[in-house]
Amino acid sequence: HDDGEVDIKGRAVNLTDLYVYREKDQNSGAADGDLVFTMNTNPRSVARYQYYFSTTALYQFHITQVGDVNSTPTGRADIILRFAFSPPNNQGMQAMAVTVVRGGSQTTTKTTVKGGFIATTPLNSNAVLNTVPVGGSNLTVFAGLREDPFFFDVEQYFRVRAGALGTGYNVNTITVRVPKAFLQAGTGANTFDVWSTVSVRDGVGGFKQFERLARPAINEGLVLTPQLMEAFNTISPRLDLSAAAAPVRQEAVATLNAVDLLDGKDNVDANAIAKAFLPDVMRIDTTRPSGYGSATNSQGSLIGGRLLLDDVIDITLGALVGSPVGDNVSYNGTPGNPAQGHKPLEPNFPYLALPN
């Protein structure tokens, strides 16, 4: 959820979570065929304070069109959705440039279908929902602060009463409604691999990948050595199975083995689990209902994307130890425990709860 900060990495360029789901599985009244992508950054943002997106970074969704749901991810993007931000104006709004890289061409859009600039939503303002024309389709784009929907009992290590990381904090979110037809681009693909990245200026006029995130608790939970985590963040998923990435995989397997033995039993094949989780992408089969633990393919990889209320930590820990595991927290929390519980999700796009 949060792999920490270093001198050159502030929270504005720190990825926290990726969500990918069919919109009709979040809102039964939504149009059939639309997907929602959510990229959250800026973890541990305190309440009632305006945070901004970096003006020197590129925030990106990478998408692969997958022909066979049981195949190993290629980690090669067929489509990239890229977002760049200007400095805020006197109303606290940042203008966005939305770039689509697809089919060998690149198109940048800075205005909505009505001709206005693509704008973020300042704190304590009504949501700005930008309809952005790209490649013959319309994307709906929201960018701004929302409550962090993540929940995990990390505090249980330090005190008896269970708490839920994320409660009371905000994140900067980029949430996009994307028509499936736009992602298919004539291929007929119904399955997609998605991952998010942040790139920063490289000092010589270009950008370099700085952060990467897809499935929860992979690079933040399995890769513990700072140097290896930094290396993992800078490579494409297509290199996850390469010889150069072998030290990262070895550390992930060692961590898996350690977690597996917490109950004193060797329950799972750590190498098989690592194979199911790497390359690290979020796969979604759009022919079935969304949900992080709703389905796996023949390789044991999760293929249901991720909904906002999915208990991803319980699902992930269960896979790692070979049996159901619960951390006793949920999005809604336990009645009477003020350390748990989030605001209700919004009924309409972008769905995340209003900021604290």
Q: What is the predicted function of each stretch?
A:
Residues 1-356:
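Surface-exposed extracytoplasmic segments
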